[in-house]
Amino acid sequence: MKSDVETLNPTRVKFTVEVGYDELKPSLDKAYKTIAGQVQVPGFRKGKVPPRVIDQRFGRAAVLEEAVNDALPKFYQQAVEASDFLPLGQPTVDVSQAPDPKDGGDLKFSVEVDVRPVLELPDLESIAVTVDDLQVPEEEVETRLTALRERFGTLTGVDRPAADGDFVSIDLRAEIDGEEIETAKGISYRIGQGNMIEGLDEALTGVAAEGSTTFTAPLAGGERKGQDASITVTVQSVKERVLPEADDDFAQLASEFDTLEELRADLLSQVEQSKKFEQGLQARDKVLEKLLETVEVPVPESLVEAEIHAHLERESRLEDAEHRAEIEDSTRQAIRSQLLLDALADREEIGVEQGELIEYLVGQAQQYGMEPQQFVQMVDGAGQVPSMVSEVRRRKALAVAMEKATVTDASGNPVDLEELVGGTEEDDVTEDATEDVTEDAAPAEEGQTVDPTGDDEQAAAEATAEDPAKS
């Protein structure tokens, strides 16, 4: 086999392949066996029809066509492996010459396919970004203390009109043109939640127990979803939450601390850690943004179109041109990020340990509210493990970039990102959960890595992957 590759543009190449007739013999033999198993010829058992009879009854051309169809993927893959390119998406094949049914001859074909672009990456130590100063507002400590007091608060009935933050028990009746559509009784609701019916909070404010009011709002569900209905709400009771005093007794009740001062100090530490984490996330986003500004990352249009199509199909909005335009920029930016981090991971020779993959899968399961084993089975069944491997690899590549980049705050002080790079709040998983997933994962020796190259990486590039800047 002879093959050449021509670069059409930074993200697309053309392979030209020539295969000698002798090299097609395994595929020809296979073609005869395939056809013999599909046809019935009098005097021969199924699958035992000799080649000469197949040629006589069905023609040599049919055999060659079957052989060429079998051989094309194999020789295309050999041409890819002989090159330095990683195909992305589906190839376009053109057979320019097929063997002659009588005289034989070579098979010649060409393949155009999108490929991962070759990027010129900078020295990571040349990357410098500035983030906001670390500020710990005292009011956030008070907010956390109030939230803790609310957890230990008690509900007490009040003889006054309902106000924001009160807890009410209500009955609801919805009507359209005098026809009762739906009713509900004894619903507990906190005024100000804003998660039930549009305008409900405003309608309830100022209404006392045993009082009622009527307002108009669109229905949130059912057969008449979106239609305006007349909503009558009757208040059965009004209660307010009485908070315990913030003192040493409360500190002992709500925490492991003996004094309110110790509890406040702990809440202050929590706020400080949260702000450090936010500062670290800002640094991560800015490092990636700086890399994208520095590196020219051409994007294969087929990937953009495939991702947009998949997104619209999931939302059943394939004909929504306006929404297509809305998501195109974000899709293109996400793919640029993926391609850049893939290239960076290659240069830094980053692999993925099985334990790292398991930890990531457990974290994702928690985000989706699923049991780790159930999530792993779902991901494996959908063939999405390779995309998960690539996502972990990209995260590690970005972590390397953050470690080597210079990050300072607005005051010029260096920012320590060790906690974020070494593991985030989202990465903390229980040992039991990790062990559960390990039982479903493929076994690996200590230190063994999951191969992020070849078919795995190609599948990952074609799959929907989250933007690493937002993970």
From Swiss-Prot:
It catalyses: [protein]-peptidylproline (omega=180) = [protein]-peptidylproline (omega=0). InterPro entries: PPIase_dom_sf, PPIase_FKBP_dom, Trig_fac, Trigger_fac_C, Trigger_fac_C_sf, Trigger_fac_ribosome-bd_bac, Trigger_fac_ribosome-bd_sf, Trigger_fact/SurA_dom_sf. GO terms for molecular function: peptidyl-prolyl cis-trans isomerase activity; protein folding chaperone; ribosome binding. It is found in: Cytoplasm. Keywords: Cell cycle, Cell division, Chaperone, Cytoplasm, Isomerase, Rotamase. The keyword Cytoplasm applies. Residues 407-471 are annotated as: Disordered. Residues 416-443 have a biased composition (Acidic residues). Residues 165-244 form the PPIase FKBP-type domain. GO terms for cellular component: cytoplasm. SUPFAM superfamilies: FKBP-like, Triger factor/SurA peptide-binding domain-like, Trigger factor ribosome-binding domain. Its EC number is 5.2.1.8. It holds the Pfam family Trigger_C. GO terms for biological process: 'de novo' cotranslational protein folding; cell division; chaperone-mediated protein folding; protein transport; protein unfolding. Involved in protein export. Acts as a chaperone by maintaining the newly synthesized protein in an open conformation. Functions as a peptidyl-prolyl cis-trans isomerase. Consists of 3 domains; the N-terminus binds the ribosome, the middle domain has PPIase activity, while the C-terminus has intrinsic chaperone activity on its own. HAMAP family: Trigger_factor_Tig. Belongs to the FKBP-type PPIase family. Tig subfamily. This is Trigger factor. It comes from Kineococcus radiotolerans (strain ATCC BAA-149 / DSM 14245 / SRS30216).
